[in-house]
């Protein structure tokens, strides 16, 4: 009888110990996830405030065929910030060429002093610099624009922070991925109404509250990306929608869609941006209460 009693006591202790260990694992996992999201949030701010980020943008000027003058004078086609001379220069578009002329010397590619420069629409990797400013030509669809940056932009507040929903692990959802045939593209528009083409890669499907939802994914450079709107769009979250990245599917076609990492388009932070508009297929009739909230 004594042996049986001790056995029961041992079993009870083992059960409690296992429970504590499992509980400890659960807490550890939650803490690891919180650390992961904290790193994600810090990296977001670092990226936005970097030289290649969007907080330093101070101008966006769409280039038409022919000659356009720029400078601080309001009479110019492109009005630059007040620190620039009244008539600073011009850009002339002739077919597939851009001809820049300046009344003061500027730095080409942060290295060579120039007062004029010509390049083709296939060579958009050149930059021009003057004091704290830098500008270059970007292409969106079939349209071209001068994008102007100020690396001393006062909008780059050291206290800059992005508001988020509280972390909710239930919004880290296991879904399935159905790939499109290779080479499939889709055409959507940006906020200016310009058509833009994106490589569409497939459909991500998942369940929320027992209901099935799906979103079309595309490639953004090397990243698998989803852009979407939902019931919070325009209220608690940015009016233009949000996006998120996801990893490659496993061997069974499973993916993880983590809405806690849903982030705002650059347009939520700066007016001089050219964000895409999520296609109708990616407008969810559900409130995604996770990830970044509207920036004010």
Language-model-detected regions and their locations in the chain:
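N-terminal cleavable signal peptides for secretion/export
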Residues: 27-78
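Flexible, glycine-rich surface segments
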Residues: 174-232, 238
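Bacterial N-terminal signal peptides that target proteins for export
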Residues: 2-14
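Extended, aromatic/histidine-rich regions of cofactor-dependent oxidoreductases associated
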Residues: 160-162, 233, 254-256, 260-296
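Surface-exposed beta-loop interaction hotspot
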Residues: 131-196
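Forkhead-associated
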Residues: 57, 62-124
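C-terminal motif of bacterial Sec signal peptides marking the signal peptidase cleavage site
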Residues: 23-24
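A short, structured loop/turn motif at beta-sheet edges
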Residues: 248-254
């Amino acid at each position: 009888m004594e042996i049986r009693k001790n056995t029961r006591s041992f079993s009870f202790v083992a059960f409690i110990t296992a429970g504590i260990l499992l509980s400890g694992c659960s807490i550890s996992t939650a803490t690891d996830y919180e650390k992961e999201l904290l790193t994600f949030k810090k990296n977001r701010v670092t990226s936005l405030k970097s030289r290649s980020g969007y907080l330093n943008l101070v101008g966006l000027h769409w280039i038409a065929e022919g000659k356009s003058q720029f400078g601080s004078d309001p009479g110019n086609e492109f009005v630059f910030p007040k620190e620039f001379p009244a008539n600073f220069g011009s850009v002339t578009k002739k077919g597939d060429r851009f001809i820049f002329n300046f009344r003061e010397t500027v730095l080409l590619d942060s290295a060579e002093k120039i007062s004029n420069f010509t390049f083709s629409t296939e060579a958009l990797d050149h930059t021009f610099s003057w004091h704290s400013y830098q500008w270059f030509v970007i292409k969106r669809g079939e349209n071209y624009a001068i994008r102007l940056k100020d690396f001393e932009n006062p909008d780059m507040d050291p206290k800059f922070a992005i508001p988020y929903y509280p972390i909710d692990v239930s919004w880290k959802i296991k879904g399935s991925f159905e790939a499109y045939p290779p080479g499939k593209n889709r055409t959507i528009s940006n906020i200016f109404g310009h058509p833009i083409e994106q490589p569409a890669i497939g459909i991500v499907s998942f369940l929320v509250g027992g209901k099935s939802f799906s979103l079309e994914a595309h490639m953004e450079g090397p990243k698998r990306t989803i852009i979407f709107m939902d019931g919070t769009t325009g209220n608690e979250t940015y009016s233009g929608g949000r996006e998120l990245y996801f990893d490659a599917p496993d061997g069974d076609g499973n993916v993880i869609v983590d809405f806690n990492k849903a982030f705002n388009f650059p347009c939520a932070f700066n007016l001089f941006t050219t964000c895409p508009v999520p296609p109708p297929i990616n407008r969810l009739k559900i409130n995604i209460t996770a990830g970044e909230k509207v920036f004010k």
